[in-house]
Structures are given as structure tokens and as C-alpha cells.
């Protein structure tokens, strides 16, 4: 390709999908002419950059090491994360046109554009440190825009040494460190699914008023028994109290009244078995239907059974609740600038889909406020901000071991931060996930 033709093609004709394709052989040509651009956090921290030595050798560097491993990704042995999603922008150069011509004649590479992400370095670091050495994932979103503020998955890896450790990482099936658990992990939702069951109940009955259930600590139907946590007897409950108590018996009863077909319809309205507005993800799975038996319906209604969901999907459902029922399309690229700091393009928030009515979202929000004020997430009460949320304990083996879940949002009158957290093998939601949520909310409002 001639010089002028190359510059015209590179600056006007190329498309994101084409240049990001692994089958596009022109990527090597672009890399020959452009020093790969930086990836920055929204608060001005360098997340990825290319260092060029005196002899022209280039080395991709990740100053935060493991902290942004999955979401920023890597640029060798293939690409992942933002390195893949933003490949087009990072290999673009919007230096002054005549400078590009001069650089071409002098054999000097152009400087690639800078991708400014939506990620907040302080919030990401807080999430990373709070999860600690435990397996799991943390997602933080801005519900009114869809900005992804933090995304952590563990076990992780150091992208600075990805090439040296590649074979070990690929073959380590025990840790699966390359797997982004936030978007690709599949977990039983546990009691966080009671948000879905509650929505289906409201759509079927038209109101939570008039509901009453006498919890005796266990419920048996067709020789299948469901117990509340530790067999706790909650006594007489209305709907709000049953939700705040995370009463398995009440919600197992509700599930049998609703039936599999109704729960399937509402679940698919919330994007189970459906495409998600993400670049890389695994579909959440909901298998209940009209022919499902009572025991499976009971299990499914409380978030067990065969249902599997990713932390990001639960964050999206929570985001819709926090945003009057409207899900905004999640995104990671806030803007792209040239080497001189001039803005080339910005991402405007866009509606993705209305998952529920504004009234339904408000009612679910009230249920979730009760969990914090009077229920299983009371540790988040009285911390200088308001929170609505739902804990979950998702059993995953025959020994009754549980993953710890929390989904929720803060500043309930005008929500500005949504979180979804899972700690593998962490026990109850209040034990492991809620303290991480507290760290995130504290960092967001007070740091």
C-alpha cells in the first residue's frame, strides 16, 4: 500500500470490527507504523502503555500488575479485555496529518491514540484488595449511564509476564486464572434470585399487599423439603418481611404458586437465556418451564436448581432496578484522545432495554431497602449513605458449601453506584460479600 493510500485508508476507511478481527492481516501493518496507545483510568492513572527503548524495542507495560488483569487484559499470546476491545483505537493515530507523513519518510512510528476507560483506579484497587486471596468477582456500575467503574476477577495473573507464564496459565484447570469470572463465570444465584421471583409474583398478583406466610423453618411438598438458613423459624411474614428475612420457605411456596412457565417468562424478560449487551460473556441459564416438577420449582424460586448466572448479569439486573427499570448499555471506553490530549471521540450513554416498569423497579427497590434496614444486609445500615440490596448464599456441592453473594446500589433516592459481588465458598452473603460492598461504598463516597 502506498504512503498516501495507507494514510487515507488508516484514517478514514477502517472499521472497529475489521481491524479488531484476528483474521485481519493488516493489523501487523498498523503495528509497524504506530506505537500502541495508552489505556488510562477515568481518574488519570496509566493502566497500559508501550515503552520504547533506544534501539526501538517495544514492551507493553501494565503499572498495576494484577489489579486490572482481566478487564484491561493483555496484548501478547492473543489479546483480551480492553486490549482487544479497543485494539482499533490503540492502533490508530490522530497525530497531525503532516506529522504522520513526516514520520513515514523518517521511518518513525506515529504515536497511537489514548483510550480513556470508564474504570476508576481507586474503586478497582479497593475491590481487588477487599476480595483478597479469595476466588470470586466484583462488578461496579454507574446505573444512569452504564459506565463500568470496576471489574475484578480472581484468581488472576500478571499481564506483564503473560508470555513467560502462558503455558502454566493455560494448563492450570484448578485455578482457571485466565477466566474472567465477572462476565464468564456461571454460578447459582442463591437468594439474589428472589428479586426475580418477587417481580414475577407482582406481575402475576398485581400487588404485594395481602400476602401472608407462616414460616416454620421448613416446608415440604411432594416429599421434597426446603429449609430456611439454619432452620430458623420466621413466623408470620408479609411479603416485605419474607424478602428481608430471605425466607426460603416463603419463596418456595411462592414459586409453586407461580409455576415454571411464569418464572421462565419473567426470567427471560430479565435476559436469562438471552444475549447480553457485552463484548465477551456467557449466557445465563434458566431451564425451568411449564412441565417442571414441584421440587425443582421450589429450588429454582430460591435461586438453586439448575439456574446459572454471571456476576455481571446480576449487576445489570440491579442496575435496571436502580435506574427506574431501564437498563443502560454497559461500556468501558469513555473517550479516545490523541497524543496531544485532544478528544477524538466520546461514548454517549445509550438505552439498551427496559427490563421492567418504573413502578416495578420502585417496588423491588423498597424490598431491597428492607434487606439493609431490617434484614440480612443490616451491616450496610447507618454508614453515611443509603443502600438497597439483596444477599445470597448459593449452595454448590453435596456438602452444602455456599458461595456468598451481594447485589445492591447506594444513594437510593438517586442511585449512583451498583455493585454485584460473589465470593466462591464464602458462606452467607452477610459473611463475605457484604463487607466487600461496604468497602466499595466507603471508597466511593469517602476516599
Predicted region positions:
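Periplasmic/cell-envelope proteins involved in peptidoglycan metabolism and beta-lactam response
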Residues: 1-166, 177, 186, 211, ...
Amino acid at each position: 500500500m502506498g504512503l498516501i493510500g495507507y494514510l487515507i485508508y488508516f484514517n478514514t476507511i477502517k472499521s472497529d470490527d475489521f481491524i479488531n478481527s484476528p483474521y485481519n492481516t493488516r493489523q501487523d501493518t498498523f503495528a509497524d507504523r504506530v506505537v500502541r496507545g495508552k489505556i488510562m483510568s477515568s481518574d488519570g492513572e496509566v493502566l497500559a502503555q508501550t515503552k520504547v527503548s533506544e534501539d526501538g524495542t517495544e514492551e507493553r507495560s501494565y503499572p498495576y500488575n494484577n489489579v486490572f488483569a482481566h478487564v484491561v487484559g493483555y496484548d501478547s499470546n492473543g489479546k483480551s479485555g480492553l486490549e482487544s476491545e479497543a485494539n482499533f483505537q490503540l492502533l490508530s493515530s490522530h497525530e497531525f496529518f503532516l506529522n504522520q507523513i513526516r514520520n513515514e519518510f523518517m521511518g518513525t512510528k506515529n504515536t497511537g491514540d489514548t483510550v480513556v476507560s470508564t474504570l476508576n483506579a481507586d474503586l478497582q484497587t479497593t475491590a481487588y484488595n477487599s476480595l483478597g486471596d479469595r476466588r470470586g468477582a466484583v462488578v461496579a456500575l454507574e446505573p444512569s449511564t452504564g459506565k463500568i467503574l470496576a471489574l475484578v476477577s480472581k484468581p488472576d495473573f500478571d499481564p506483564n509476564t503473560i508470555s513467560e507464564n502462558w503455558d502454566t496459565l493455560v494448563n492450570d484447570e484448578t485455578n482457571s486464572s485466565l477466566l474472567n469470572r465477572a462476565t464468564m463465570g456461571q454460578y447459582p444465584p442463591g437468594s439474589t434470585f428472589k428479586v426475580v421471583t418477587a417481580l414475577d409474583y407482582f406481575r402475576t398478583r398485581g400487588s404485594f399487599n395481602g400476602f401472608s406466610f407462616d414460616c416454620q423453618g421448613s416446608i415440604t411438598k411432594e416429599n421434597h423439603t426446603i429449609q430456611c438458613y439454619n432452620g430458623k423459624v420466621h413466623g408470620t411474614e408479609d411479603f416485605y418481611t419474607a424478602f428481608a428475612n430471605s425466607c426460603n420457605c416463603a419463596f418456595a411456596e411462592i414459586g409453586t404458586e407461580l409455576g415454571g412457565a411464569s418464572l421462565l417468562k419473567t426470567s427471560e424478560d430479565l435476559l436469562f437465556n438471552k444475549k447480553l449487551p457485552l463484548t465477551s460473556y456467557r449466557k445465563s441459564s434458566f431451564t425451568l418451564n411449564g412441565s417442571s416438577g414441584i421440587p425443582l420449582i421450589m429450588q429454582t424460586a430460591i435461586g438453586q436448581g439448575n439456574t446459572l448466572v454471571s456476576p455481571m448479569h446480576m449487576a445489570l439486573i440491579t442496575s435496571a432496578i436502580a435506574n427506574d427499570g431501564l437498563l443502560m448499555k454497559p461500556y468501558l471506553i469513555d473517550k479516545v484522545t490523541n497524543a496531544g490530549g485532544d478528544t477524538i471521540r466520546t461514548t454517549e450513554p445509550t438505552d439498551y432495554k427496559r427490563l421492567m416498569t418504573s413502578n416495578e423497579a420502585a417496588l423491588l427497590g423498597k424490598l431491597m431497602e428492607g434487606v439493609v434496614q431490617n434484614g440480612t444486609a443490616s451491616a450496610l445500615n447507618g454508614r453515611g449513605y443509603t443502600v438497597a440490596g439483596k444477599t445470597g448464599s448459593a449452595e454448590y456441592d453435596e456438602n452444602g458449601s455456599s458461595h456468598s453473594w451481594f447485589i445492591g446500589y447506594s444513594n437510593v433516592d438517586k442511585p449512583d453506584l451498583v455493585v454485584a459481588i460473589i465470593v466462591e465458598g464464602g458462606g452467607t452473603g452477610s459473611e463475605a460479600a457484604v463487607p466487600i460492598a461496604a468497602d466499595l461504598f466507603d471508597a466511593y463516597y469517602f476516599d
